[in-house]
A protein has these predicted regions:
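Helix-loop junctions at the membrane-solvent interface of multi-pass transporters
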Residues: 45-46, 71, 116-117, 141-142
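Cys/His-rich short segments
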Residues: 1
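Interfacial loop-to-transmembrane junctions
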Residues: 116-138
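Short, structured coil/loop segments at alpha-helix boundaries
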Residues: 4, 25, 137-138, 142-143
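Functional transmembrane core segments of multi-pass inner-membrane proteins
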Residues: 4-110, 149-154
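C-terminal transmembrane module of polytopic alpha-helical membrane proteins
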Residues: 138, 143-154
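Hydrophobic cores of alpha-helical transmembrane segments in multi-pass inner/ER membrane proteins
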Residues: 11, 106, 132-141
Length: 154
């Protein structure tokens, strides 16, 4: 098994743990985000020529999320922001944007369901980490083909 495959397997394990913990507690432990960031750093070390897209990936979603939190209280949790920074280091900027897109779509659909079923109100919060994790896994496994398909329309 290649190092890249082992790293992807480790990332999937971390994301599964993050999803389960966040769904139950609405918190993402820093140690999980740190483990994901270590996987990102290892992936950069395995292909050092491609380091810049990974650094941009760590910032391209997490910084706007942080800035949005400064404007809208509670827009995202700190764990969500750190999760996307760590995932961005692993994924690179293009797949990080794709992961965020899928996370927002999945989380938005769940939020609409909660509102429609009257299980939550507009001011209620729910764990967003599991949806971000789903987006990260999709981007990690299918990012290339999805981006190629999308770019064919441009």
């Amino acid at each position: 098994m290649s190092w890249a495959a082992l790293l992807a397997l480790a990332v999937c394990g971390i994301l599964l743990s993050v999803s389960l913990i966040d769904a139950e507690t609405q918190t993402i432990p820093d140690r999980m985000n740190l483990a994901l960031a270590v996987c990102g750093a290892v992936s950069v070390l395995l292909s050092p020529a491609d380091w810049l897209p990974h650094v941009i990936g760590a910032l391209c979603v997490s910084v706007p999320m942080f800035l949005l939190c400064l404007v809208i209280d509670g827009a995202f949790g700190g764990g969500d922001i750190k999760l996307m920074a760590a995932a961005g280091l692993f994924l690179g900027w293009q797949n990080t944007l794709l992961a965020m897109f899928f996370g927002i779509v999945f989380g938005g659909m769940y939020g609409i369901y909660l509102l429609a079923a009257k299980k939550a109100g507009k001011k209620d919060h729910f764990a967003f980490g599991p949806f971000l994790c789903a987006g990260i896994v999709i981007a990690m496994l299918f990012g290339g083909p999805v981006l190629e398909w999308y770019c064919a329309f441009l």
